[in-house]
Amino acid sequence: LGDVYKRQDTKSEKEYISWEDRLAALYYEYAMKCGNKFVADWFELNLNINNVLTAITCRKYGFDKANYIVGHNEIAENIRTSNARDFGLGDSVEYLPELQRIAEETDLIVREKKIDLLKWKWLDDNTFFKTFDIESVFAYLLKLEMIERWVTLDKARGEKTFRELVGAMKMGSENALEEFKRNNIK
């Protein structure tokens, strides 16, 4: 962490980056060095989502986005330096069009739900073939955290979503077990 702090503690960055943003940058950089690629990718996804939405908001209100982008990955650097509509990301961020639509949402609760749905889809896409792996357990935990967050806001909907999740997991585990049996019985 010391190297990350030193790299960020240049005179020009000292003037603009708040301590909260420095801490966030350290958090994401540390998390993205995790030995588990899935976990590292999850944190990078969150960093990228936050940075893209921040850049869109900065553009909308005339702020210099370079002062608000956190982290030093390739996407963060592209966002800081590009004036293109897509921040020079082109096809490298497959969820960029969806994020641009989300950024246009004026209702903050709807916007947050759409962000969580984007993350949920990413979790599903990245654990589809990993039924019995630790990645699926981590994804399950992350989904439960999302549900818990929304249950406090809308109890009836949260309970319904939770029941749907449990039902889907039961169905998925039954299917996986049947497939496992078919493949291993000779």
PLM feature segments, named:
Residues 1-5:
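Short, small-residue-biased leader/transition segments that mark boundaries at the very start
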Residues 16-184:
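A contiguous, surface-oriented mixed alpha/beta subdomain in the mid-to-C-terminal portion of proteins
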Residues 8-18:
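Terminal low-complexity "docking" segments
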